[in-house]
Amino acid sequence: MRKQILIINRVPCFFILLFFLFSLTYLNSQPPKHSEKEKIGYLLETLENSNLIFIRNGDEYSSKEARAHMQKKLEYAGNRITNVDQFITYLATKSSISGKPYYVKYPDGKKVESSIWMRELLNNLEEKK
């Protein structure tokens, strides 16, 4: 009788231990998420290296100039920008003075709003992880 009780008590413990081990394996197999700061850095670096034309208030700028401008805006915003969505929405999509949207222009002349372009980059980054 005593052996039956011990066996019955061991069975749930075995399954709990097994579940715990599988959970740890699953959690360790997930790639680490990028921090919000890393995501913003990725967008800025990709912009700088894109060699696209950046259009701000109707004027064209190089991708390096665009990155410098957005970096300045980010530094000025300080801790008010806490995630990549805020960065795109408040800093990388339109002029804070005129309210006009920013655009990126491809070598073939196609223009796309910077918000769309950046959100596509962000989606690509999220899919890679």
Segments (PLM) and residue ranges:
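Bacterial N-terminal signal peptides that target proteins for export
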Residues: 2-14
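Bacterial N-terminal signal peptides
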Residues: 12-23
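Boundary at the C-terminal end of the N-terminal hydrophobic targeting segment
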Residues: 27-29
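Short N-terminal segments immediately surrounding and downstream of signal-peptide cleavage
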Residues: 31-50
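Compact alpha-helical subdomains of small soluble proteins
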Residues: 32, 53, 58-129
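Intrinsic disorder/low-complexity signature
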Residues: 6, 23-25
